[in-house]
Amino acid sequence: MPHSTAAPATAWTHPPVRVGLVGAGPWARAMHARMLAAGPETTLAGVWARRPEAAAEVAAAYGAPAAASFEELLDTCEAVAFAVPPAVQAALAPRAAAAGRALLLEKPLGTDLETARAVADAVAEHQVISQLVLTKRYHPATRAFLAEAATREVTGARSCYLHGAFLEGDFATAWRLEHGALLDLGPHLLDLLDTAVAPIVSVRATGDPTRWIELTCEHENGAVSQASLSGSVNLPRARTRVELFGPGEELVYDTADIDHEECWPILRREFATAVRTGQGTGIDAAHGLHIQRLLASARP
């Protein structure tokens, strides 16, 4: 898989952040390990996974050690990146926070509101930096869309996130097949609607998360939005689209022409900057808990 290692235009002047990686599955291999090893803002300090042979394989590809235990991984790093199912992340992230490690977290924080709250509470209690891998948020096209949306009066919105990854392949994993598109794709779309329209105050759902689920959201500003989610439909490529409507011209965000490889250098730089300066981005565990509350209220 091609992977952009292009660094942002300004030089990195801090020591690289030593990041330990938890997980050695498809997403750990395809994104986390490559991104963290590319630097210059980060180095891959070690890899730990439930299967030692898988951790060793991922670590060896980047000249990093494979840790024999989670505790050993914590000893080698100053930040931890998670590329594991939500239930595993929710069990381990509070331990990393208690050890004073910064957290690069996947969405959703946990499989339910209780476990997600435990992660967010640990981050707050131990005052560690946290950042959520809401991939699309780190793409320049997304940021341009959100900046323009902030200038608009929005009456209503329609959106979708659709693909067929649950049908077969590496990403048809047990937790995705069990919980479906609501927990896997829902955080991305709810985050975009919550940011582009106005904070979401209520969500109603209909359908089956493992097949197709429809969400109707009410926002603080009185706007109403709808979101269609499915990971079980046959499409030539993933489709993410948000349409904003109001008194002015419609505003459309569509990922059809964006290269997600552009996200990784930005994500890496912003996480490392947050760790080195102690100033988070706002796309953090607290925001993840807000999204998890919306997911919980949308459970059909």
Model-derived features with residue positions:
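N-terminal Rossmann-like dinucleotide-binding module
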Residues: 1-62
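C-terminal helix-rich "cap/oligomerization" subdomain common to oxidoreductases
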Residues: 1-13, 72, 79-82, 128, ...
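Hydrophobic residues in well-ordered beta-strands that form the structural core
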Residues: 28, 68, 105-106, 130-132
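Contiguous beta-strand/loop segments that form the cofactor/metal-binding neighborhood of enzyme cores
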Residues: 2, 190-255, 269-277
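A short helix->loop->beta-strand "cap" motif at the edges of active sites that frequently abuts
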Residues: 64, 99-101, 126-129, 222-223
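Mid-domain beta-loop-alpha active-site segment that forms a flexible
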Residues: 133-140, 168-200, 267, 287
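Beta-loop-alpha module in the N-terminal Rossmann-like domain of NAD(P)-dependent dehydrogenases
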Residues: 62-120
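A contiguous active-site-proximal alpha/beta segment in oxidoreductase catalytic domains
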Residues: 110-168
